[in-house]
Amino acid sequence: MAPPRKGELSPEEKDLLGVIAKGNVEEAGRLLGSKNVHVNCLDEHGMTPLMHAAYKGKVDMCRLLLRHGADVNCNEHEHGYTALMFAGLSGNKEITWMMLEAGAETDVVNSVGRTAAQMAAFVGQHDCVTIINNFFPRERLDYYTKPQGLDKEPKLPVKLAGPLHKIITTTNMHPVKIVLLVKENPLLAEVEALQKCYRVLDLICEKCMKQKDMNEVLAMKMHYISCIFQKCVTFLKEREDKLDGFIKSLLKGRDKDGFPVYQEKLIRESIRKFPYCEATLLQQLVRSIAPVELGSDPTAFSVLTQAITGQVGFVDAEFCTTCGEKGADKRCSVCKVVMYCDQNCQKTHWFTHKKVCKTLKEIHEKQELEAAKEKRRQEKKQKKDEAQLEEAGATSEEQSAPGPDATKEADPNLWIQTDQTEETELTKEPEARAPRPDSPLESETALADIALQKIQDSEE
């Protein structure tokens, strides 16, 4: 079949675009089986069916098109948009991840010079930005599953590549979340396996810093996860409660406010151990964290997360107190302050939260009471302002209403009566009024005559 041309669609291809808009996967599958349908056909704007499906957020449709060989990096759009850019604009995290796994390039720019991550950030789809920025191709990890050079064995067993890749690509950098991911996979939760994993992470970190296009963000992330793995090894070797003990150490809060001091110190120590002191990112992190006292904002975790994942602080979202997962929607039933993503996280955190739960409850109730008082005060103030406005309006209406004198002047009969009175006065005292001059010259003569008459009267 000849390569597709922009705007040259067969009737079946036009039907396919319509079916994609409706989300009918079965009908789309039937049309894709037709010899008259090219999976990468282009509409008049240069959009492929995959771009249409990604922009409309059709997950199953995207999966179907990729199975049929859709080109995830097709760049025929009139403004240079790719399928990954449309996925980011749609805000669909699953489709964004799907495009990346299918091999979508993240550094391609459109006609205005923006990458997919920048376009997603521009429209406020910060979750998609985080996914794109944290994506790590599986092929780069599979490289270490094969013997290289003089090595007789690979640095990373094949069975560990999948679980390790899942942790590397996670967008949640909370240390408890990383330990939970290790704990849930029996293959990883062993000393030998973790040792191999953190050595590979150190190699990736070194490669990121020494390659031509240096990637400090990815290097810092690999180093951070490596530090968490090394602590896991320590607890597996030295503690009877093993990883559960590590999680408790990370969550244990100090008595006065429940702040997890050990967790904060661990993250600060991990950043400080970054082996490339000249890195700009390291210097920025140190400047942001060093002046902050333990227990104050910003925490080391929040600063590190923003630097690595690109998550912004002004986004309104609730995070789980235990594992840091975004979108927590369950509150402690007593204090109504602490958030969790599920009951397991609440149970895990209860051993330390119970010490400060009542205190937090009192603080919360006090804040609610003050908020209610402030609300009532604002309502009273608003009512008072409205009453003053109404009173001012009534006063202005009274002032603008015509009085009894104005009514008298408005009566034409009174005007006539006044004119008659004036005529009578003029008849009785003709000397009292000077004649109205017709010209300036006559006016001056008349004034002179009056003045002369007054002088004569005074002499007599």
Curated annotation (Swiss-Prot):
Chain positions of ANK repeats: 45-74, 79-108, 159-188
- Source species, domain of life: Eukaryota
Q: Name the keywords, alphabetized.
A: ANK repeat, Cell projection, Cilium, Metal-binding, Repeat, Zinc, Zinc-finger
Region (Disordered) residue spans: 371-460
Binding-site residues, Zn(2+) 1:
320, 323, 341, 345
Q: Where does Zn(2+) 2 bind?
A: 332, 335, 353, 357
Residue ranges with Basic and acidic residues bias: 371-387, 425-436
* PROSITE patterns the record matches: ANK_REP_REGION, ANK_REPEAT, ZF_MYND_1, ZF_MYND_2
Subcellular location(s) per record: Cell projection, Cilium
Q: Which GO terms describe its cellular component?
A: cilium
> Mind telling me which SMART domains this protein's record contains?
ANK
- Zn fingers (MYND-type): where? 320-357
Molecular function per GO? zinc ion binding
Q: What does this protein do?
A: May be involved in the trafficking of signaling proteins to the cilia.
Q: What is this protein called?
A: Ankyrin repeat and MYND domain-containing protein 2
